[in-house]
């Protein structure tokens, strides 16, 4: 059983945390995030040790689940507003490329038409070259969600490995048909 919820979360320098009712607001150099936690858990800021402490009232299963979840979300918020999150995507395939036009990501990945995806306002998307896409933001969930949506437009296929993949992702290549003699 995980006891991650019992660990306090240290507040980095340059980050402010404010709690009102069930709303947690975190502000730092990369941006501002807010989260409304469940009533099963309690969140408090210990100003002496400069830590966020998450506790729960009951010991029933949902309370234990939300205890660890809330602690992990608060920790991700603190890292996000301080350092930010980043996902890198690679586009593999002949003629496959990406570009940015205004607030739209344009992808040519083997379909008859170009695919257009609107970039969320809280994210920064760049294309260092035509075969790489870099997604940055302070919210870990929205960075990962947008990266997953882009990857799902053309997942890597198992025979040649063409498609959109995360940087460093290993695609298992299947052998083709073997000719019999």
Swiss-Prot record:
Biological-process GO terms, alphabetical: cytoplasmic translation
InterPro entries: Ribosomal_uL6-like, Ribosomal_uL6-like_a/b-dom_sf, Ribosomal_uL6_a/b-dom, Ribosomal_uL6_bac-type, Ribosomal_uL6_CS
Pfam family of the protein (one): Ribosomal_L6
GO MF: rRNA binding; structural constituent of ribosome
Sorted UniProt keywords: Ribonucleoprotein, Ribosomal protein, RNA-binding, rRNA-binding
Family of the protein in this entry: Belongs to the universal ribosomal protein uL6 family.
Function: This protein binds to the 23S rRNA, and is important in its secondary structure. It is located near the subunit interface in the base of the L7/L12 stalk, and near the tRNA binding site of the peptidyltransferase center.
Record-linked PANTHER family: 60S/50S RIBOSOMAL PROTEIN L6/L9, LARGE RIBOSOMAL SUBUNIT PROTEIN UL6M
Protein name: Large ribosomal subunit protein uL6
Organism (species): Rhodopirellula baltica (strain DSM 10527 / NCIMB 13988 / SH1)
